[in-house]
Amino acid sequence: MAELGLNEHHQNEVINYMRFARSKRGLRLKTVDSCFQDLKESRLVEETFTIDEVSEVLNGLQAVVHSEVESELINTAHTNVLLLRQLFSQAEKWYLKLQTDVSELENRELLEQVAEFEKAEFASSNKKPIIDITKPKLVPINEGGTTELLNKEILRLQQENEKLKSRLKTIETQAVNALDEKSKLERVLQDLQLDQGNQQDFIKAQDLDDLENTVAALKSEFQKTLNDKTENQKSLEENLAAAKHDLLRVQEQLSMAEKELEKKFQQTAAYRNMKEILTKKNDQIKDLRKRLAKYESED
């Protein structure tokens, strides 16, 4: 259909609609003609009429014709709505959204093209068109194999999208929980380190008290020896030197004990488990962040 730019199938659909419209128009014109014929047969029986009688006849005819024309216009509008509804229903089954340009309905050039097409199409027959009662309806396109596959694919994609959204939400929840658990573990580790420091401080304080008591005792003994001016001064000096050596040895032992305590604490199962848990949680957080970045890039 070169004039309207439609393919053969759509051309046949347009011709069928034109045939239907011409038939309805012909029936309505017959009705209008019958109004005038009824008026002639029922009212125009006198040879002369007064002005009032003529006005009454014309007013009655006007009312009848007005009613018939109005009824036809309303019916035509409703018919066009039903036709659009059929087309839109088919489009929606393909997940399409059609648009109409109402301003084109008053395009004189296009209207003339349609008139020429109608004239050329129906010029070969002088008979008035007859409504094709057996005219087939629009076939629902969802019965075809292609449409069924398309609908299934759309449904599958929608379901997959919902699954991805749910999975992303689950991953986000896991990430938040992992961060919370990491924070808790860090606080526990800090508490353990603080307890360790307190224990070391307690041990240091206790050893220092012992050393101070020992030194004080030695000083007291040395002072007593000096005051007594006994002949054991040399022995006392040796004892003092030995005490100093003992002090250094005790200090060294204290340092070694501190290192040993720290080493033993690091070798304890609680410390190793805590360190292993923190390492695993850090790895999980890194993995979750990578996965979140991957899903964000896909969206």
Curated annotation (Swiss-Prot):
Disulfide bonds: none annotated. InterPro entries: LZTFL1. GO terms for cellular component: cilium; cytoplasm; cytosol; manchette. It comes from the Eukaryota. GO terms for molecular function: identical protein binding; protein-containing complex binding. Residues 145-299 are annotated as: Interaction with BSS9. The keyword Ligase does not apply. One of its GO terms (biological process) is negative regulation of protein localization to ciliary membrane. Residues 145-299 form a coiled coil. Pfam families: Leu_zip. Keywords: Coiled coil, Cytoplasm. The keyword Protein transport does not apply. Its main location: cytoplasm. Belongs to the LZTFL1 family. Self-associates. Interacts with BBS9; the interaction mediates the association of LZTL1 with the BBsome complex and regulates BBSome ciliary trafficking. Regulates ciliary localization of the BBSome complex. Together with the BBSome complex, controls SMO ciliary trafficking and contributes to the sonic hedgehog (SHH) pathway regulation. May play a role in neurite outgrowth. May have tumor suppressor function. This is Leucine zipper transcription factor-like protein 1.
